[in-house]
């Protein structure tokens, strides 16, 4: 536990000790090494990490200690001993004994350590390198041959191990077991033969494996994609935010010559602490994809997209939008500033409320829920919760850092976790969650059955709850009656910010209801507009199915919405804002190239509503942000929105503030009757795996190598009726198509079958035309 965490506890006992002649007062339980840090005294260490349990493995942090005049007989590891009253500590700075002990440990660590510094990825930012200079001998007394191993060993497609570099600090193994709950990497053998390894025939299967690379102090673990690519002093580092989910991770982006070479987890004690998932760490090659769009495109008379100048493209887009009935599909990946730009552009330049960010399965009930039931939970509430309820939410796959925070409390105090799902997943198994087993579409009864929640309880709801009529109404009722805190956690990083920016058909920026005159006056005043459209607009699916003549599309994959979305959109005049060629650009009349996250400044809003600002990491990029292009397009239409820069959009949005007026109560939706199935049928359940066929993961072969195998999950009862055993092929089909995959037998609801939603061999909209809560046939392949 860190000093900061200890200090937040009420009535913590404080203890004063002396370190190198200086008094320091710290909370009871503070480790000596942490108390020294408070004085600015740096004790060398390798195994110590403030977020891992003490191990005392490397022995590099030895210091002289005496308590009430009685000295320890030999130097002690300062990373394992808590401060006590009357304690006097002498570090290497004041004690020759401690200094000699540290030099001796360093000499032993270097006996077999290779001279890889000129080529090692850790060179230039290596604690061993630095501390060998500051706390080691100037010459080695060892004259024998150094131990060598085969190098490197791939413990996964993403992580490589150089065993001779390892100092056995056990940071990687402790992280895997204590933080991620994935004990697939371990210390093998004993004594001089001890080394890091993985279990036989089991690769390092973890969504968080990249953190072991980052916290390794000596370059024993390296990332495949970064190995031998650059030196730290070649890189320009920029603090950034992750664009892959709503967790809100702080990040660091390292760029060389205008190209991103690596990304690291940033430090934010309130959000991701010092961790991130492998998707956030390694999924960035889409920025330099071969099909990247760098110039505006216009479809010519022959139906071919041709490069055009910006004035030509703006004129063509304006001509197609100016007098048409228009909708705006924003997508869930945009920054807050860009979402605000789309929101203002729709209302001012196009005079419509036909705008929606939900590029996924959605419902009108969800709009009512989001407008009337605000998120009140935070990460801190999870840290203090007595009970966490997961509803249509798979934390490890849909918001990995939320899983880590829940798991931390489970390890610390066995927090109670309940999950409404069709079966116990890998992550809920690690949390020892109570499964409220239900088929997809039958969640309402399960939600209504939950009792015993308090104001300290936290209910976390995923975006998939919108797929079951009545589920979100039941959640709202549960929150209102129990007093529990609510967290709505969508998958994509931009959705919470887009909601706040008013990129929905029934809300203006700041969660102001469209049908409230005072709310419209608030926004019209800021925007300098005489009036705003007053009727609730169309949702994403309604826009696609409508007779609208034109649609502005910002980074939307039509296969995330419905199987025939592309065909229906192709009949309309499409203006596309895209990073690279896609299904939408294939049917667009005008395509504008937009900047990626590393090429522009902006912000995301995480699931708890915290704004995560970032600056451009690749400043020499010529690509423009969405909001800047929208502002130019509005000028061309003749209805300016006056948002020429990201900063202008941010300042205007922040000046608006949140709505403090009346909020309409949620309209209760009527749940559907639970489906009944025949013997050869099942109700389809699905969600997206963290590592799947998502477009932002394209080109990441090493990352794809650790994606979990696509399987059909069936019950033992169904396996018996089909006469199949584990790993046999099972065919799931309907009138649209079929998916055939190996089966896994789990304690799943007997009427259900589960498939990954968008993984290799199981892209449900493409294969089956549905994603969940539908009846399918199940047979032995």
What do these predicted ranges mean?
Residues 347-355, 410-416, 475-488, 570-573:
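Structural alpha-beta junctions
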Residues 2-37, 45-49, 65-72, 86-449, ...:
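N-terminal export/assembly segments and adjacent metallocofactor-ligating motifs
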Residues 365-368, 428-430, 444-449, 497-498, ...:
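Short, charged, surface-exposed secondary-structure boundary motifs
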Residues 58-81:
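N-terminal single-stranded DNA-binding subdomain of primase/primase-helicase replication proteins
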Residues 41, 82-87, 191-195, 293-297, ...:
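Short acidic (Asp/Glu) and glycine-rich catalytic loops that position anionic groups and cofactors
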Residues 48-57, 190, 646, 726, ...:
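Short, glycine-/polar-rich solvent-exposed loops and beta-turns at beta-strand/coil boundaries
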Residues 458, 463-538, 685:
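A glycine-rich, hydrophobic/aromatic-adjacent loop/helix-cap motif
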Residues 2, 43, 343, 386, ...:
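A cross-kingdom feature strongest in bacterial/archaeal respiratory oxidoreductases
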